[in-house]
Regions:
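Formylglycine-dependent sulfatase
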Residues: 2, 7-13, 23-482, 491-527
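Flexible catalytic loop/linker elements that gate and position reactive groups at enzyme active sites
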Residues: 488
Length: 527
């Protein structure tokens, strides 16, 4: 499905308006597509969006009307946990149903990492595909491209890409907006490829004659770094990693949300007469936060608040298109985030200065990277008007690791033996039809610490590391002593491990039980 890549290069808000006439045919045969037994499914996966970053989860310094409406139309889930406190391991677990700690090479991925999910593995996309769905991944990827680390030829068809793991269509960022290469990948090719500017990427050394943020700070005309992010400069912003070339294929950060939204709407239109699954992973609100001009000033919190408003707009675009095509009633939308929030993650965007009384993690302690609850508890909304009654709220304990098995069950997917080894079918809880807690969830911090959370308790095992993570200035939760917190009390303030040795023992047993299951798959990739 080839698309016009004009979306990178201009405001082109008009390009996002519906291009199919309002009276367009939305029936297949005599049956309305909205009355098919299989729902369309869209997972909207935000980046670094905290529990307290949305109005419907308590935010007062940013307006999120589209997300608020989505919550009113369905169920607000208040006890959902990402699989890890950082991006790559959370996304790996979500899409494979396997905890990332079982699989080598699932730390925060470089932009030239090889495919972390291998073709032999069963994925969420595979589940939908074998149930007869059209499948797509659009937006942030951060799970590697090509066969092996650092061996990609970005000027040719990548030998291994998302088409090999169940996605019929993909339009993705190779890693994140702050890492090279700063191009989109569509169907295994660099999108809008410019043959006059061949692409080279390195994470070990710069290319001769190419400026860097460290040596040429005068070229950082859009955003300067607060820490790190001082290697290659693209669009006046320093990045992690080095690259050369790109030309017309290079993105402009202010147009990333437009481009992602446009391709998402295009996929919906193209597949409106068949069931489809879309993994829509936004760049917002990850750094560098550089939203389009039309979102500037939407929040008193500066660029971070404006990026939240831009995320809300993306949600509104998707919902509006579904409504226009007559698909909204039978489309299941799940909205959540890959990990907790971070305020200063490497750019001088005044996010700390302008935060005011906003609490990105809501009532929870710390944020991204951390073992504390703010690292992994995330906002979540489920909306499916045909089946899920609106205006609900559930505090059932839920882990994103279970979404593959749950959604596979919903659509009648054939799940091969041994696939999604950590994913449990908890569809009833996800849809608000039951309030049953998961017995426990595992939460992986940036230093690989595996915490255990039940409804009442949070156990953090001893680990090494600084109390404060330098750069973002986040409390790590790392301690050489075991920590046990009663989650019925606020903010993980009192370590009660000595008072409750029986609970500590039980929580340790959960961790050992999971570790002893071992890895189900060993990647041939050299890391």
């Amino acid at each position: 499905m080839k698309r016009d890549h004009l979306f990178y290069y201009g405001t082109l808000a008009s390009a996002l308006l519906p291009v199919v006439p309002a009276c367009a045919k939305t029936k297949k045969g005599n049956a309305s597509v909205d009355n098919r037994p299989q729902p369309n499914v869209i997972v909207i996966y935000a980046d670094d969006l905290g529990y307290g970053d949305l109005e419907c989860f308590g935010a007062t310094r940013v307006q999120t009307p589209n997300v608020n409406a989505l919550a009113r139309s369905g169920i607000r889930l208040t006890n959902v946990h990402a699989i890890a406190a950082t991006s790559t391991p959370s996304r790996y677990g979500l899409l494979t149903g396997e905890y990332a700690f079982r699989h080598a090479g699932t730390d925060i991925a470089r932009g030239n990492a090889g495919m972390i999910i291998r073709p032999e593995q069963f994925t969420m996309a595979d589940a939908f595909k074998n149930a007869g769905y059209a499948t797509a991944a659009i937006g942030k990827w951060h799970l590697g491209m090509g066969d092996r680390d650092g061996e990609q030829d970005w000027n040719a068809q990548l030998p291994m890409h998302l088409g090999d793991i169940g996605f019929d269509y993909h339009y993705i960022m190779a890693a994140t907006a702050d890492r090279t290469p700063c191009v989109f990948i569509e169907q295994g090719h660099v999108a809008n490829y410019d043959a006059s500017a061949p692409i080279e990427v390195s994470y070990t050394q710069n290319f001769e004659g190419e400026p860097t943020g460290k040596e040429n700070p005068e070229l950082l005309f859009n955003l300067k770094a607060s820490h790190g992010h001082n290697q290659s400069i693209v669009n006046g912003i320093g990045r992690i990693g080095y690259m050369k070339g790109g030309g017309r294929a290079l993105w402009k950060d202010e147009n990333i949300a437009d481009s992602i939204a446009a391709h998402a709407l295009g996929f919906i239109r193209e597949h409106r007469e068949e069931p489809f699954f879309m993994y829509l992973a936004t760049n917002d609100v990850h750094v560098p936060r550089f939203p389009h001009d039309r979102f500037r000033g939407k929040s008193p919190m500066g660029l971070r608040g404006d990026a939240i408003a831009q995320f809300d707009w993306t949600v509104g675009q998707v919902v509006s298109e579904l409504e226009r095509l007559g698909l909204r009633q039978n489309t299941l939308i799940i909205l959540s985030s890959d990990n907790g929030p971070v305020v200063d993650d490497g750019y001088a965007d005044r996010a700390v200065e302008l935060l005011g009384d906003h609490r990105p993690a809501g009532p929870y302690r710390s944020g991204k990277y951390s073992t504390f609850e703010g690292g992994t508890i995330v906002p979540a909304i489920v909306s499916w008007p045909k089946r899920v009654k609106g205006g609900q709220e559930s505090d059932a304990l839920i882990s994103q690791i279970d979404w593959l098995a749950s959604l596979g069950s919903l659509v009648g997917a054939r799940m091969p033996k041994g696939s999604a080894p950590d994913s449990q079918n908890r569809l009833g809880t996800l849809l608000g039809e039951e309030k049953e807690d998961r017995p426990y969830v595992l939460e992986q911090a940036a230093n690989h610490t595996l915490s255990v959370r039940t409804r009442e308790w949070k156990y953090i095992p001893p680990s090494k590391g600084p109390a404060i993570i330098s750069g973002p200035g986040i409390e790590s939760g790392y301690s050489r002593e075991p920590q046990l917190y009663d989650m019925r009390r606020p903010y993980e303030q009192e370590n009660v491990s000595l008072q409750h040795p029986d609970v500590v023992f039980r929580m340790q047993a959960y961790t050992e039980q999971e570790r002893n299951k071992g890895a189900s798959y060993t990647s041939p990739i050299s890391k």
